[in-house]
């Protein structure tokens, strides 16, 4: 039993410090403005940076989910069509649940890696890997 406790302590010492942090992750809110028949997400780059994701990946997901065309210009995204900030933020929440939060430990400390033709969500906190659907 003594050996078990020593091994357990050794294993705990080898874990990264992020595992023991208990801060809550808050999804950043997108600030959008509708002008004519276009919607501008003013803080798009900040949202992507807060999620630690490539802005192109996030934009591709949003465009597919909203069923529209659009592009990045500077730090903002331009979408063809009128979309409320409520709808945009709801889709960003979906993105976070599918492509940011770890499926094992529910932490946002992840990154997307590719192994061959497969995209994987790799957790920096617990080390878990989970396959992702392509955007």
Swiss-Prot record:
Write down the SUPFAM superfamilies for this protein, in alphabetical order: Translation initiation factor 2 beta, aIF2beta, N-terminal domain, Zinc-binding domain of translation initiation factor 2 beta
Source species taxonomy:
Archaea, Methanobacteriati, Methanobacteriota, Methanomada group, Methanobacteria
Q: Output the HAMAP family linked to this UniProt entry.
A: eIF_2_beta
Task: Please name one Pfam family that this protein belongs to.
Answer: eIF-5_eIF-2B
Keywords, A to Z? Initiation factor, Protein biosynthesis
Q: Name one GO molecular function term.
A: translation initiation factor activity
NCBIfam families registered for this protein in UniProt:
aIF-2beta, PRK03988.1
* Protein's UniProt keywords contain Ligase: no
Instruction: List, alphabetically, the InterPro entries matched.
Output: IF2/IF5, TIF2_bsu_arc, Transl_init_fac_IF2/IF5_dom, Transl_init_fac_IF2/IF5_N, Transl_init_fac_IF2/IF5_Zn-bd
What protein am I looking at? Translation initiation factor 2 subunit beta
Encoding gene, per UniProt annotation = eif2b
Q: In which organism is this protein found?
A: Methanothermobacter thermautotrophicus (strain ATCC 29096 / DSM 1053 / JCM 10044 / NBRC 100330 / Delta H)
| Signal sequence coordinates | none
User: What does this gene product do?
Assistant: eIF-2 functions in the early steps of protein synthesis by forming a ternary complex with GTP and initiator tRNA.
Q: Which family does it belong to?
A: Belongs to the eIF-2-beta/eIF-5 family.
């Amino acid at each position: 039993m003594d050996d078990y406790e020593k091994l357990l302590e050794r294993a705990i010492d080898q874990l990264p410090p992020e595992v023991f942090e208990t801060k809550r992750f808050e999804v950043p809110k997108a600030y959008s403005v509708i002008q004519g028949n276009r919607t501008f997400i003013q803080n798009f780059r900040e949202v992507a940076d807060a999620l630690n994701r490539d802005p192109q990946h996030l934009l591709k997901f949003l465009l597919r989910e909203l069923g529209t065309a659009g592009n990045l210009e500077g730090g903002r995204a331009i979408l063809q069509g009128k979309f409320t900030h409520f709808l945009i933020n709801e889709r960003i929440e979906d993105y976070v649940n599918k492509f940011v939060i770890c499926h094992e430990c529910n932490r946002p400390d992840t990154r997307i890696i590719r192994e061959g033709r497969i995209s994987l969500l790799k957790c920096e906190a617990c080390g878990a890997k989970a396959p992702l659907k392509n955007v």
